[in-house]
C-alpha cells in the first residue's frame, strides 16, 4: 500500500462553478425542456463522477453515458439520477441494467427482444429508449421502418417505451439546415407510427448542443447537452451565430522544469526538426503526448507564458515539450505555463488547439490522460 503524491505540476483545473453557470445559461435558452447532461467519455475528459454530482445537485435529472461501465461508475459515486446508456445493452448485461436502474438505448429488434425476454425471466418491465436513424447513418432503427418496428414492439409484454429519440448529423452546419429540419420531421412521423399502435412515449428528443441553440422546434421535452456544458462553442456553433455565454470548464496548466539558452545551429528534440537560426531561450515543460498534448502540435502549437504566446519548438515527446520563451520576459524554473486557459489578456481554448490540427475540441479534452490530476474548484 502506498500513498499517491501528485507534485508534478501538470494539472487540469475543473471549474465546477463555470459548469453550473453553463447549465443555467442553457436552461434559459431551452425553457421547459429537461436537460440530459451528456457525461460519457469521463465527461469529455472533465471527470464524470464530480461533474455529474455537481449537476445533480443543481437539479439535473438525466445523464447520458456510452457504456454500462460508465453508468456503474456514476452509481458507485452515489448518483441517483436517471442514466441513459447510449451504447445499448449488450448480451449478458441485462441483469446489471435492471439491478442498477439503468435505461438502455435500443436500436435493433434483436436487442429489444433479448431485453424483453430477460425482463420476463425476472418478472419485471424493462424501460427503454428507442433510437431511430433519421439521417446520421450510424446506429438506430431506420426511419422508414417505423411502422414495422412499432408493430413488433407493441407485442412485447415486458417493454415500456419511455422515449423515442434520434440524433442530428449536421445541426452545426448552416448549409445543412434543410436536412436538419428533415430529420426533425422524420422523428415526428416515427412518433406518429407508434401512436397508431397505442404506444405513446413520454419523452421525445433529437436536439444536441447545436440543435438546441439553432433549431428551437427540435427541443421537444428533452435535450441532450454535452459540449455546451463544458464551455465549448467555437467549433460546435457556426462562426456567424451569436454564441451563448458559456465558459470553458477546464484549464490545463503546468510549470517550467528547466530553462536554457541555445545558440544558432543548436537543435531541439527528436529528429532535429527545430534548429535555431539565432540565439533563443528554450523552456522545457513536463507535459507530453501521453498526457494528451497531441504530438501533431510539434513545431505548430503555442502555449501562454507570462501572458505571451510562446511557440512549441521541436517534437513533442511522451513526457516533455519544449517551448520558445525568448519573448516571454523573465522565465525560470517554476514559471506557470498555460496550455488551455487565460493568462493576462490572452486565452487559449480547446477549440483553438483543435483548429490548428484539424480536429475538434472534444478530442482535445477527452485526450487528457488520467496521469494528469483533475483539480476541482
Functional labels for PLM-detected ranges:
Residues 2-20, 24, 28, 70, ...:
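Active-site anion/phosphate-binding pocket segments in diverse small-molecule metabolic enzymes
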Residues 4-6, 10-14, 18-21, 28-205, ...:
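Active-site-proximal beta-alpha core segment in soluble small-molecule metabolic enzymes
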